[in-house]
């Protein structure tokens, strides 16, 4: 820590890292820890010149006062009586932390795994809370020590990881009130930024625990391509290696030798996947080390000083530097055949030969650092190993049960992980095991996958559990295909958010309360979240109601004007507290909203596996307010020294001026080698009426209008990327009239209710319009059954609620 931020005594040390972040240390031996730890790698991320604080004595207590915190301490071993910090601006009781207090109001973080989960599980703490404070205890983590000089280092390729001395406490107090985003950004400052992901990681992943042959796998990829279903990542589960081994060796879960019965020419197989536009990861379970039946055994045994003739197993030991070197040499050989990155499937607990060292953390740390060698783009795929794990993306959440309960938990789980800075979870989309077949459930899970950090389809080896869309009936099949195509189309948008995350510490997915911390309603929609800067996503996690033929999701829209991303319908949230309602959707879509002024870039040629910067782009515009989006692209090459600020990048700013009804696509700024010299642009305005259009000041008739989505599409054509392009409406861009009658008729038409009741409902709507709801609530239809009894039927609650959404949206 910078000496300027430190107040120190014989056995205690306090560091004022920011005006809201305090480090608290107690040491029985009077020595303090300055090395990087497994979690914390930078305690000097903010200039002390910008930190305002006063330090003084008052009634025998040490007092530290900043604009946000008031700390008092008796200079004794930490106790609830002797150490407290008040967060200014928060409730006097709940906003004051006493040492050892329970974090009962913590907004939570994430968990190591969802293995075996069938619904909600407990989560660890995050760095934000309702009460305005959170505590990160780093006392037990190991420290990183460079071999050559003993100095702390997190950048050395393989720094030594050493246990801490006993009798020391090391706490970080986050007192940010409800400045949640700032708290997480400073957590990144303390623990390191989230790395930039390679572009291919944001596309669709195909994964299945299944004994494919090479020919079967390649044929499947060809079938996807023929169906126009894009994938960018091919996951090969554990059957790539030999799994049927002699019982004397133990289980077949660990392996490093290709199963040549399934993959007779591994290098050719991986080359073919690359040729088809797919990057590849192989699954490994490292626990059992390297045994005598493995091809790499002899060389590794000699390296480790074991006589290969003995057949003695090479024990897995990440605390042994010799083993680690030999272990990675073995992986490098496989990478030389074409493996792009590794799926580290560690499920065997948290104990190594070194006190306090979790093997999962060590594997993640070493694999990620190793993956960056020789200018490669670093990437690994593994489970969460505690705070700071965001430095080693991507996260594998584990094997979940196929159930509505599992689906229902995942949006909340994903968004809440942002509270501990963990933004790149990859779930088993569709669920992995057990459960029951439910085609609607699978479709909804695919839709969640589109608006998830990573979209990786996965399933078990059961012949009945394949996730290929053609295994499902219509309309589920089409919903699945549409979802996968949309995910690929969203890549320019998501990749820009990927850059935002790496540079600004702004995650792709943020809970609603990050942006609206003082709105109580924002805490009441746990499955709703911001998906990047422009969109709010609300996955449907309940089964369809049979009466309305729709499924619902609880929605809260903050004050302002919003548009349905798919249909262009406009929602006016006029009051300061926002608008609460249930959104009802058929199987084909889920609720996604864009605020007025929203701009979303899509790649038009989305039915390919390409991850190149596209030559054709579509810009979705949601009018009603000014908007701006800066599209970030790079040349696909990672910075050799890991400094992404030195990468070749290009920014294309797209802006919409609502007053003049003009969209401007600015000339690309930055490295001209990044973007195509010419690019074909299409601009689609959602929620508008048909209007006359000019392109660069000239009237254009190359437009089309889609009544279903209230969308005006302008085909701009192929333009040089070093010149501005404008799309304007000389007579103004008029918002579309709200098709209330059409939408309510569609609800009534789909409803599985008596025809006379449909007709009565339609008549009430024709007569009363948007004021028809009281009449609809009192409607009923009586009929006689075959025994002469009277049967009374009213509009079902689901039909009424679906109609209510339409009537109240504007």
Each model region followed by its residue ranges:
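Solvent-exposed beta-strand/loop surfaces of large extracellular or lumenal domains
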Residues: 36-51, 306, 563-587, 692-716
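A conserved hydrophobic secondary-structure block that centers on an alpha-helix together
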Residues: 116-117, 194-197, 201, 207-264
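Charged/polar low-complexity intrinsically disordered segments, enriched in acidic residues
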Residues: 736-790
């Amino acid at each position: 820590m910078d000496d300027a931020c430190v107040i120190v005594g014989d056995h205690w040390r306090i560091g004022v890292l920011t005006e809201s972040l305090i480090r608290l240390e107690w040491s029985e031996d009077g020595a303090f820890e300055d090395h990087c730890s497994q979690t914390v790698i930078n305690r000097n991320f903010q200039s002390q010149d910008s930190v305002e604080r006063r330090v003084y004595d008052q009634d025998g207590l040490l007092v530290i006062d900043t604009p946000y915190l008031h700390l008092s301490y008796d200079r004794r071993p930490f106790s609830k009586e002797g150490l407290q910090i008040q967060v200014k601006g928060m409730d006097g009781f709940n906003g004051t932390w006493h040492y050892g207090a329970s974090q009962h109001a913590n907004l939570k973080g994430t968990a190591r795994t969802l293995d075996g989960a069938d619904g909600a599980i407990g989560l660890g703490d995050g760095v934000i809370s309702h009460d305005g404070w959170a505590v990160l205890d780093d006392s037990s983590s190991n420290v990183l020590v460079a071999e050559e000089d003993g100095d702390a280092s997190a950048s050395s390729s393989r720094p030594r990881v050493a246990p801490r001395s006993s009798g020391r406490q090391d706490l970080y107090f986050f007192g940010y009130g409800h400045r949640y985003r700032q708290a997480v950004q400073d957590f990144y400052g303390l623990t390191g930024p989230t790395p930039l992901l390679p572009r291919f990681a944001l596309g669709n992943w195909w994964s299945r625990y299944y004994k494919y042959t090479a020919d079967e796998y390649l044929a499947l990829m060809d079938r996807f391509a023929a169906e126009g279903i894009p994938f960018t990542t091919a996951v090969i589960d554990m059957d790539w290696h030999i799994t049927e081994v002699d019982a004397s060796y133990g289980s077949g879960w660990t392996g490093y030798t290709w199963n040549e019965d399934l993959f007779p020419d591994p290098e050719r197989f991986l080359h073919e996947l690359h040729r088809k536009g797919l990057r590849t990861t192989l699954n490994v379970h490292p626990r059992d080390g390297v045994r005598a039946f493995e091809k790499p055994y002899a060389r590794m045994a000699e390296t480790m000083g074991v006589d290969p003739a003995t057949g003695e197993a090479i024990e897995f030991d990440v605390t042994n530097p010799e083993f680690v070197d030999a272990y990675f040499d073995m992986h490098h050989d496989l990478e030389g055949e074409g493996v792009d990155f590794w799926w580290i499937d560690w499920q065997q607990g948290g104990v190594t030969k070194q006190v306090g060292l979790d093997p999962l953390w060590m594997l993640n740390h070493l694999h990620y650092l190793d993956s960056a060698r020789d200018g490669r783009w670093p990437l690994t795929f593994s489970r969460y190993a505690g705070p700071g794990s965001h430095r080693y993306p991507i996260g594998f959440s584990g094997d979940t049960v196929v159930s509505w309960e599992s689906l229902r938990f995942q949006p909340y789980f994903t968004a809440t992980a942002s509270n501990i800075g963990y933004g790149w979870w990859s779930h088993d989309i569709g669920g992995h095991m057990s459960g029951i077949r439910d085609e609607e459930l699978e479709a909804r899970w695919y839709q969640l996958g589109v608006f998830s950090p990573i979209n990786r389809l996965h399933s078990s080896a059961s012949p009945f559990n394949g996730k290929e869309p053609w295994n499902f009936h219509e309309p589920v099949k089409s919903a699945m295909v549409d979802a996968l195509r949309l995910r690929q189309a969203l890549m320019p948008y998501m990749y820009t958010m990927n850059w935002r995350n790496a540079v600004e510490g702004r995650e792709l997915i943020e809970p609603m309360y990050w942006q609206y911390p003082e709105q109580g309603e924002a805490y009441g929609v746990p499955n709703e979240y911001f998906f990047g800067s422009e969109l709010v996503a609300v996955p449907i996690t309940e089964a369809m109601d049979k009466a309305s033929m729709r499924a619902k999701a609880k929605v809260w829209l903050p004050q302002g004007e919003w548009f349905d991303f798919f249909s262009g319908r406009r929602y006016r949230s006029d009051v300061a507290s926002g608008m609460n309602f249930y959104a009802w959707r058929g199987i084909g879509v889920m609720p996604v909203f864009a605020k007025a002024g929203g701009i979303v870039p899509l790649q038009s040629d989305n039915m390919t596996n390409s991850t190149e910067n596209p030559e054709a782009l579509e810009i979705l515009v949601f009018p009603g307010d000014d908007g701006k989006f800066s599209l970030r692209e790079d040349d696909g090459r990672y910075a050799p020294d890991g400094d992404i600020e030195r990468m070749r990048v290009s920014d294309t700013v797209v802006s919409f001026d609502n007053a003049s009804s003009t969209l401007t696509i600015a000339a690309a700024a930055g490295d001209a080698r990044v973007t195509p010299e010419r690019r074909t642009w299409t601009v689609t305005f959602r929620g508008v009426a048909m209007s006359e259009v000019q392109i660069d000041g000239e009237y254009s008739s190359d437009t089309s209008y889609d009544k279903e989505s209230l969308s005006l599409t302008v085909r701009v054509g192929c333009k040089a990327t070093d010149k501005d392009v404008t799309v304007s409406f000389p007579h103004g861009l008029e918002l579309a009239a709200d098709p209330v009658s059409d939408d309510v008729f569609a609800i009534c038409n789909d409803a599985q209710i008596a025809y006379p009741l449909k007709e009565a409902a339609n008549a009430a709507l024709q007569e009363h319009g948007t004021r028809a709801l009281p009449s609809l609530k009192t409607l009923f239809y009586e009929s006689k059954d075959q025994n002469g009894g009277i049967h009374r039927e009213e509009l079902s609650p689901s039909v009424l609620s679906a109609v209510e959404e339409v009537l109240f949206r504007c």
